[in-house]
Amino acid sequence: MLNIIVCVKVVTDPEAPATTFKIDPEGKHVVPAPGVPPVLNPYDENSLEAALKIKEAQPARITVISAGRAIPRSVIKKSLAVGADDLIIIEDEAFQETDSYITAFILATAVKKVGTFDLVLTGRMAADTNAGQVGQGIAELLGIPAVTDARKIEVGNGKVRVERVRADGYEIAASSIPCLVTVSHEMGNLRSATVKGLMAVQKQPFTVWNVADLAITLPAGRSQARRLFIPAREVNCEIVPGETPEAAGANLAIKLRETSRF
């Protein structure tokens, strides 16, 4: 049986209108407006869907791991409702300020604590940072190969075969297992939970760890936000005169040539 670990992050809904967000220039972080809900990171949902597809093809056990300062249970338990077997929540006030390296360190430590694993899946990046560094960081800390940007994953005979997304198509990569794979949105959306799944998850147990349970001291971060701001936008509007549409068009062409925009 394959043991698959899926690392999932809870983020502020990336589909919320950008105008509802504000910037805290002192704390250097984005402040969502009240009422904007937390959701599973869409790319991590893609990785969970990849795990479920593998489980449909062969015997497998899926363990979801999520780390954060305060993880909403109603959101993260969606992973159990759609078919994951186990859920591990790593929660600690010490996670208030974490960068990609610290996050990768926490998750890699948790994976080691879980023990046996064949495949670790993550989203290609988080929707709230777009950094795309945690997956590769976990692989480095675990000392296992990493294959990125998967749109299809097949596992068999001790190897994983991955179709990797490229700008001009895709390429095929193969690796021995254990291996980490980051998953792109081309894998497909996460399936909806069934009524049976939603009911079962209400009684399904899950595990909660903190820093003490992991027996670690958090390392210092390796990146720092220097400035976070909303770029100033200057909009200039000029009315091109013309007594007729033809004249206005001719004047517009002249204007574009004068400003080197045409």
Regions found by a protein language model. Give the residues of each.
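N-terminal glycine-rich FAD/FM-binding segment characteristic of electron-transfer flavoproteins
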Residues: 1-262
